[in-house]
Amino acid sequence: MEHTEPEKTDLKSVDLIEMEDTEKLIGTKRKFTDVPIVFRPKKKRVIIEYEPNTLDIPVSDQESFLKLSAPYITQLYSAPNVTEYTLRDFFVRDKIMPGLIQIQEKMFNIKKTSIRPCYICKRPMTKVHWFYLYQCNECGNESLKYRYASRNLYGKNALVIGGRIKLGYQIALKLLRAGCRVMITTRSVHNALEFYNQEPDYNEFKSRLFVYSKGFDLGKARESLPDLVNEITNLFGQQQLDILIQNAAQTICFQENIDNKQQEFESLSEAEILDLVKKRGGKRLTFPPVDWRVDFAERYGRVLDRRSINTWSKNIYETSDEEIISVIQSNMIGSILIDKYLIPNMRPSEDTYVIHVHAKEGTFDTHKTMKHTHTNIAKAGLAMLTRCLAGQSENDTEPRSQWPQIHGVNPGWFSIDEYTIYARTRGKIFNPPIDEIDAASRVVHPIFFQKKSYCKSWIDYKKCHHF
């Protein structure tokens, strides 16, 4: 029998799914062998069909119901100021949570199984939690319990690096409401208390809130730290610091917040931006439905990024040397020096904590592109700092101090600050799955539940076992 060669596959005819944008940018080509390669197609973003139902959520101590036509967190997204934001959150804490058992099955229905998984458990959702946009019923209820968890911290002293707005602000509030004395640092000392004094319970904690008297810039930590240590010692006493939260970090440089393509967006409000998203096809690109999307109120006075593109969408060759150096100094060098100078000044007790705020960008086992490479490197360095200081937990043979407890926490995606107006008008962003209170709850979780040192990250209140 005559032997015939097997037919070779014509690689040019293979239906290749579109390559990564970054590969197109640098002009590289995939190398193929004689074996056909099948690329997994990108999933199209699909609008999930929801039942137009309205939920009646029972209000404790009242014969009334809270009527919801969308998950409650959308009301928090649109709160115009920190006072209203807190009041809306307190309403759930005080009026809804006591009767949580009565609303275990209160969910928004989906007509078909969603291709988008639950934010926590990653299983396909058939119903959406009454409070969260992207969580199933079980995970949503668990998240609410942790969101409103607390602990008696009277007599404890804490330092929150970067505590003026957003995540650091909410972390400081959680510690203050637990009874802790808190010092915050910020680069803007003159308006450091601008938002704290708008809180409805400000008078209850104002005597325990302190601001470091000088502007603190992580990029210049070496010059600032001796004075910070002295001020902490004068305020709390020698070796009386119990909690150190390393929150401040630079991701995007906003100093050059202008370019020659911004004219189209220069005078737009957030509401007008949202309207443009809808007009430019945002409905086809967004999840959840557009009618569940809300105007993201800028409660903290942050200026919208009016550039057509920023370094979040640039590769390392397009990013300025100054920004690369600034991000590395703030995230890596600044964090190392803070630990070096402040950990020796902490109380010698097992019930003391250092929390590094990690990020997904710093993990090695997730897909990476060439975008914001310098940020990824900086966040990975912070994760390595946690790993070295915390050790290998129970398998560690190196003798280490029993205090403080070292943790790294990934707070999750709760902000859209890194996206420019240009990206927002193209419908390329979504409602984040959680808000800054949820993110802060994740950060303080090891403190409130007195967890021992862990060398990797905490994600969604659980230990992450990969690096």
From Swiss-Prot:
<dbReference type="InterPro" id="IPR002347">
    <property type="entry name" value="SDR_fam"/>
</dbReference>
<protein>
    <recommendedName>
        <fullName>Uncharacterized protein R665</fullName>
    </recommendedName>
</protein>
<dbReference type="GO" id="GO:0016491">
    <property type="term" value="F:oxidoreductase activity"/>
</dbReference>
<dbReference type="InterPro" id="IPR051468">
    <property type="entry name" value="Fungal_SecMetab_SDRs"/>
</dbReference>
<dbReference type="Pfam" id="PF00106">
    <property type="entry name" value="adh_short"/>
</dbReference>
<dbReference type="InterPro" id="IPR036291">
    <property type="entry name" value="NAD(P)-bd_dom_sf"/>
</dbReference>
